[in-house]
């Protein structure tokens, strides 16, 4: 998601998205470890999305 889209969400929605993204990153790491992940750049995308969400949550505080 883009930062502009994330800024439109409430803090509760952002926290929900954060948990979802963290779970997705966890799953991607498992798939990478078992050599089932074809697109390894998706791990970086997930990390960047998590960072964006955390940054926007801090801005809203």
Swiss-Prot record:
One GO location term (cellular component): cytosolic large ribosomal subunit
MF terms in GO: structural constituent of ribosome
InterPro entries cross-referenced by the UniProt entry: Ribosomal_protein_uL29, Ribosomal_uL29, Ribosomal_uL29_CS, Ribosomal_uL29_sf
Keywords recorded for this protein, A-Z: Ribonucleoprotein, Ribosomal protein
Superkingdom of the organism of origin: Bacteria
GO biological process: translation
PROSITE patterns: RIBOSOMAL_L29
Family designation: Belongs to the universal ribosomal protein uL29 family.
HAMAP family the record matches: Ribosomal_uL29
This protein's name: Large ribosomal subunit protein uL29
Provenance organism: Nitratidesulfovibrio vulgaris (strain ATCC 29579 / DSM 644 / CCUG 34227 / NCIMB 8303 / VKM B-1760 / Hildenborough) (Desulfovibrio vulgaris)
Gene encoding the protein: rpmC
């Amino acid at each position: 998601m883009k930062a502009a889209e994330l800024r439109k969400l409430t803090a509760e929605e952002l926290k929900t998205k954060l948990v979802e993204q963290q779970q997705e990153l966890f799953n991607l790491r498992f798939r990478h470890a078992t050599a089932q992940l074809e697109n390894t750049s998706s791990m970086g995308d997930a990390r960047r999305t998590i960072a964006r969400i955390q940054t926007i949550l801090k801005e809203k505080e």
